[in-house]
């Protein structure tokens, strides 16, 4: 009982907790086609703690050069005011500082400050001004933070002491290739879980390792992972041009399912695409059946379901024909447990068993999705040590009980052996006495015989 209590008391010491003043639900991320991703975090950290937090996520404290980098940061800021609700100006740590050997340069745009990670491709200085002019100094190290008006509009740079706390920080991540945003089709409730421990409902580009989950009609849950190859990246189980969830109609708009009247809108401010198994007609608005696949629009075929068992787990194969479903209730039902959401700064990710789709094309135009259930993976607190400790404790207790039992049996047998020997000795003593008496009687009878003989002789 005491070891178990001690283990329970030690659990909080090893279980990671969010940092002071963190607001993980307000964090957000964005990626550009160049392979750079940025994340914004609301947390009252010092400069060094902010650098460690970015490093823990696999990135560095962000620079904010002009051009695409500034636009990405601007997009993150304008996505929402954050936990303050836009009631005050916010400060965010960036990788801008002035070392001890550098002096204040009043005529330079950065006033003698420099970026920790210079960008050769985007070497132009940031267009942001200084909210307050830095103090003149050549002997004191100073840091700079990005000030955002009401937390959404960048106002400029502000000199700060590095040991002070700000309202948040910006991180930057660099990847060689990215996956484009998947086409949702009829999918809803999209959630992107990025490898730098942030989740988002929408990402134009996703780095390798990102997992996307969505709900299809009929409460069917699907997921896919961005996988990197030699020179490109793609979503696992999704062929180019396919969607996460098939549409119940024949038309697509920007990768999403649309109704027929919307697609045939006379304004012509968008283009129409056809679902799998159909092709766009000559008029550019109607969908026609592909001749080589010999599909018909009459009726709807019910999906077939084959369930087989493999050593890795149950695999469910679902075949969706080229025709589409008019009733969502006809879709096969699959129960899946997913855990998506924003994580805190520290690495506390835990995933539940997931079902990953693999799409296979057939000559008949059908699309087959293979859902394989993988075992749960725990990336944080492992309970195997607790199980081992309990098993070892039980084994020790059983060994002690067996030892005590064996000693008791040995002691009992020893006492029985001594008592049996004592009884046997007592029985042997009367026998000796009987033999002595018999010998004495025999000797007396012998004497009597001799006396009788002698008497006869005398007579």
Swiss-Prot record:
GO CC annotation: collagen-containing extracellular matrix; external side of plasma membrane
Bilayer topology annotation: Single-pass type I membrane protein
Family matches, as SMART domains: CLECT
Transmembrane spans: 387-407
InterPro entries assigned to the protein according to its UniProt record, in alphabetical order: C-type_lectin-like, C-type_lectin-like/link_sf, C-type_lectin_domain, CTDL_fold
One of the protein's GO biological processes: cell migration involved in sprouting angiogenesis
Signal sequence coordinates: 1-21
Keywords assigned: Disulfide bond, EGF-like domain, Glycoprotein, Lectin, Membrane, Phosphoprotein, Signal, Transmembrane, Transmembrane helix
Glycosylation-annotated residues: 189, 306, 317, 370
An annotated Gene Ontology molecular function: extracellular matrix protein binding
Stretches assigned to the C-type lectin domain: 33-173
Span of domain EGF-like: 246-288
Tree of life domain: Eukaryota
Residues in compartment: Cytoplasmic: 408-459
Record-linked Gene3D superfamilies: Laminin (2.10.25.10), Mannose-Binding Protein A, subunit A (3.10.100.10)
Residues where Phosphoserine is found: 440
Subcellular location: Membrane
Intervals, Extracellular compartment: 22-386
Protein name as catalogued: C-type lectin domain family 14 member A
Species name: Mus musculus
């Amino acid at each position: 009982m005491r070891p178990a209590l001690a283990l329970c008391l030690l659990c909080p010491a090893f279980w990671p907790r969010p940092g002071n003043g963190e607001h993980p639900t307000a964090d957000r991320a964005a990626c550009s086609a160049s392979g750079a991703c940025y994340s914004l975090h609301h947390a009252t950290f010092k400069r060094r703690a902010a650098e460690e937090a970015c490093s823990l996520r696999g990135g560095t404290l962000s620079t904010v050069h002009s051009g695409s980098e500034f636009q990405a940061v601007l997009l993150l800021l304008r996505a929402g005011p954050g936990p303050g609700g836009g009631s005050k100006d916010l400060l965010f740590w960036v990788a801008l500082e002035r070392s001890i050997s550098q002096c204040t340069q009043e005529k330079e745009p950065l006033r003698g400050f420099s970026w920790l990670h210079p960008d050769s491709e985007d070497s132009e200085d940031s267009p942001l001004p200084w909210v307050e002019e830095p103090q003149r100094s050549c002997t004191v190290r100073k840091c700079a933070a990005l000030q955002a008006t009401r937390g959404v509009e960048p106002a400029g740079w502000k000199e700060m002491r590095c040991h002070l706390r700000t309202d948040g920080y910006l991180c930057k991540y660099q990847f060689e290739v990215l996956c484009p945003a998947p086409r949702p089709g009829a999918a809803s409730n999209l959630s992107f879980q990025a490898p730098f421990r942030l989740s988002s409902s929408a990402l134009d580009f996703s780095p390798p390792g990102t997992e996307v989950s969505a709900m299809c009609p009929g409460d069917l849950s699907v997921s896919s992972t961005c996988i990197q190859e030699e020179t490109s990246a793609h979503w696992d189980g999704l062929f180019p041009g396919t969607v996460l969830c098939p549409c119940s109609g024949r038309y697509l708009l920007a990768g999403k399912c649309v109704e027929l009247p919307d697609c045939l809108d006379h304004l012509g401010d968008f283009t129409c695409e056809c679902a799998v198994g159909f092709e766009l007609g000559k008029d550019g608005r109607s969908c026609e059946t592909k001749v080589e696949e010999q599909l018909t629009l009459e009726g709807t075929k019910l999906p077939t379901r084959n369930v087989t068992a493999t050593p890795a787990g149950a695999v469910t194969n679902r075949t969706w024909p080229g025709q589409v479903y008019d009733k969502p209730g006809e879709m096969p039902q699959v129960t899946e447990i997913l855990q998506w959401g924003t994580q805190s700064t520290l690495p506390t990710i835990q995933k539940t068993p997931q079902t990953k789709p693999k799409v296979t094309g057939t000559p008949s135009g059908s699309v087959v999705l293979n859902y394989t259930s993988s075992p749960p993976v725990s990336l944080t607190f492992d309970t195997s040590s607790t199980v081992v400790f309990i098993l070892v404790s039980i084994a020790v207790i059983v060994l002690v009980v067996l030892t005590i039992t064996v000693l008791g049996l040995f002691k009992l047998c020893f006492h029985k052996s001594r008592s049996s020997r004592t009884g046997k000795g007592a029985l042997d003593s009367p026998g000796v006495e009987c033999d002595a008496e018999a010998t004495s009687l025999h000797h007396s009878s012998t004497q009597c015989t001799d006396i009788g003989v002698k008497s006869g002789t005398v007579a």
